[in-house]
Amino acid sequence: MDKLSIRDLSLEGKKVLVRVDFNVPIKDGKILDDVRIRSAMPTIHYLLKQDAAVILVSHLGRPKGGVFEEAYSLAPIVPVLEGYLGHHVPLSPDCIGEVARQAVAQLSPGRVLLLENVRFHKGEEHPDEDPSFAIELAAYADFYVNDAFGTSHRKHASVYRVPQLFPDRAAAGFLMEKELEFLGQHLLVEPKRPFTAILGGAKMSSKIGVIEALLSCVDHLVLAGGMGYTFLRAMNRQVGNSLVEESGIPLAKKVLEKAQALGVKIHLPVDAKVAKQCDSGEDWRELSIQEGIPEGLAGFDIGAQTIELFSKVIQESATIFWNGPVGVYEVPPFDQGSKAIAQCLASHSSAVTVVGGGDAAAVVALAGCTSQISHVSTGGGASLEFLEKGSLPGTEILSPAQS
């Protein structure tokens, strides 16, 4: 990695501002999935062992900005943090201002302070409108650490402006290092071959950039989910009422042509689980794509033959990247295709397997095989943008590695 690491910092007795991504799902004040909190713990534990005072900065959800909204408070994070750390973690009721400055001043080495949601201030998402916001945050600490890969594609104050105020003192945390290692080194720089990318999800248009970027480095491209039907329509297949982006058909044709020119093998569904609607998961059947899906029916998952086809491609690959479910995984039995992909990745222990995006990560968790995947990225849009562009605003701005 060509960026400064927290291993390079002299931390004893120093205050460290750590940008974490605690944007976790919360219902009725309870956290539904704490993987993002757990993922930040190696960095936090390391800083504490070095006797640093740790100031945690995060956002949660999309508050209006400019006002406190209890629904987006980081208060539910506190008991989870305390459980992992084994000691009290104070929550500053604001991330800037006198109350925050006092909380930082009282913070002792070896302890953690959590600042309230940075998005309660418009200066976080609109740093040009309030440059003083980043300056106030930066004033708290001796060092800055970014461990929020999932937010690093945004030029927000705590991700992009604050590290600029720490020349030669803005470092990557352990989670950030791991993300850059797997998405960078293992996928973009030196992937073991054959290299296969599996892209699902609803919209092709939102992923056209990463599709075109991946064409230059993969050997196989598996396309399924809603976007798969757009590609099938581009090949004049009958897909009935399946989700198709009409405006994306010309783009799909160009992708197919480019793949052929580059020698990239495209794999599309050969059969599908179809129904009139997917709400109940009832009255479905499997149909061959060759025969076509009639009007009035739509595909909501890949069929058994496609599972077999995709599994064979996975098993013959040395590197696999997966983003986006291949069916409506929230509604059984349309979850079977996505779960089969997850289980196939998990069983292929000799390969480098990387899963990016919230939905694909959720499927892997539902299938009970997260621990068997080489790396489950904490970034959805961030992981795709990194693969498309090779860097992110929040990673570019970190200090260079010490020579």
Curated annotation (Swiss-Prot):
InterPro entries: Phosphoglycerate_kinase (IPR001576), Phosphoglycerate_kinase_CS (IPR015911), Phosphoglycerate_kinase_N (IPR015824), Phosphoglycerate_kinase_sf (IPR036043). SUPFAM superfamilies: Phosphoglycerate kinase. One of its GO terms (biological process) is glycolytic process. Keywords: ATP-binding, Cytoplasm, Glycolysis, Kinase, Nucleotide-binding, Transferase. Its EC number is 2.7.2.3. It comes from the Bacteria. GO terms for cellular component: cytosol. Substrate binds at D21, F22, N23, R36, H59, L60, G61, R62, R119, R154. Belongs to the phosphoglycerate kinase family. Monomer. This is Phosphoglycerate kinase. The gene is pgk.
